[in-house]
């Protein structure tokens, strides 16, 4: 038997919004330590890794480890039926072919329950190696979303250049070019408004904006985003989820030959 109750049910709604446009179906791995998910997007270009720790839920019970195959669009449709202040409970019997979602209003006067059919998925887990990165940029998540959205008007790809003093986002296309430079902030009252850069060596890499715009759908989950970059390995875009862990997106840089084609 598995049961997890989340008083701040809106977190789960935001998690699904952050994932559903990128991945259509995924295995949710449920263990005593929490819920995790790892999946390539449908075009096998990017990778998503989600961790929700058990101690971040208000109550959590998992009698035995299980993996449940979920169609993300179906789960998203059901979670849309929950109000943003509802308490959400997920429940599944061992080896069940459905999962139950219960939505309770804060005053307990309205309780809805939905049963969703599970899928039989056979997904191979990819090992994600621990990496040291040349540049780690921490910045407001809303700012990153806006830069990606704005530069999408100019071109299909963004060049991210990281140096000690700041980070530059550049795009070019038929109508011209666009550049956004963010300097490292020295003194900010609110930590989430700061731009901080930890740099071992400068990095300049090119990424497809289409995917970055999918990643920024996680913006409501966290006030800050962390970008980790090194030459020739995937960019990591990480959103911390309060008290629960994170969602991380991995995207390989575009290679010069691709840009020319």
Swiss-Prot record:
Any single GO CC term annotated in Swiss-Prot or TrEMBL for this entry: PCNA complex
Family designation: Belongs to the PCNA family.
Subunit structure: Homotrimer. Forms a complex with activator 1 heteropentamer in the presence of ATP. Component of the replisome complex. Interacts with apex2.L (via PIP box and GRF-type Zinc finger domain); the interaction is required for 3'-5' single-strand break (SSB) end resection, assembly of a checkpoint protein complex to SSB sites, and SSB signaling.
NCBIfam families per record: pcna
Family annotation (Pfam families): PCNA_C, PCNA_N
Cross-linked sites for Glycyl lysine isopeptide (Lys-Gly) (interchain with G-Cter in ubiquitin): 164
PTM notes: Monoubiquitinated by the ube2b-rad18 complex on Lys-164. Monoubiquitination at Lys-164 also takes place in undamaged proliferating cells, and is mediated by the dcx(dtl) complex, leading to enhance PCNA-dependent translesion DNA synthesis.
Localisation per UniProt entry: Nucleus
SUPFAM superfamilies linked to this entry: DNA clamp (SSF55979)
Function: This protein is an auxiliary protein of DNA polymerase delta and is involved in the control of eukaryotic DNA replication by increasing the polymerase's processibility during elongation of the leading strand. Promotes 3'-5' nuclease activity of the DNA-endonuclease apex2.L in response to DNA damage.
Name of the coding gene: pcna
Protein's UniProt keywords contain Nucleus: yes
Name by which UniProt lists this protein: Proliferating cell nuclear antigen
Domain of life: Eukaryota
């Amino acid at each position: 038997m598995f049961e997890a109750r989340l008083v701040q049910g809106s977190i789960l709604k935001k998690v699904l919004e952050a994932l559903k446009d990128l991945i259509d179906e995924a295995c949710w791995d449920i263990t005593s330590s929490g819920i995790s998910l790892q999946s390539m997007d449908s075009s096998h270009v990017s990778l998503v890794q989600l961790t929700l720790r058990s101690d971040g839920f208000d109550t959590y019970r998992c009698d035995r480890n299980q993996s449940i195959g979920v169609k993300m669009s179906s789960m998203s449709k059901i979670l849309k039926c929950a109000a943003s202040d509802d308490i959400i409970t997920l429940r599944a019997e061992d080896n069940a072919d459905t999962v139950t979602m219960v939505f309770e209003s804060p005053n307990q006067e309205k309780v809805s329950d939905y049963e969703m059919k599970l899928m039989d998925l056979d997904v191979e887990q990819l090992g994600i190696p621990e990496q040291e990165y040349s540049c780690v940029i921490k910045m407001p998540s809303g700012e990153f979303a806006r830069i990606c959205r704005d530069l999408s008007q100019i071109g299909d790809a963004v060049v991210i250049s990281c140096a000690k003093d700041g980070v530059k986002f550049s795009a070019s296309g038929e109508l011209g070019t666009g550049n956004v430079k963010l300097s490292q902030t020295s003194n900010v009252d609110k930590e989430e408004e700061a731009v901080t850069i930890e740099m071992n060596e400068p990095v300049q890499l090119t990424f497809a904006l289409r995917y970055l715009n999918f990643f920024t759908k996680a913006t409501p989950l966290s006030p800050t985003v962390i970008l980790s970059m090194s030459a020739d390995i995937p960019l990591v875009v990480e959103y911390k989820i309060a008290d629960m862990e994170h969602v991380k997106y991995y995207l390989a840089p575009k290679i010069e030959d691709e840009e020319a084609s």
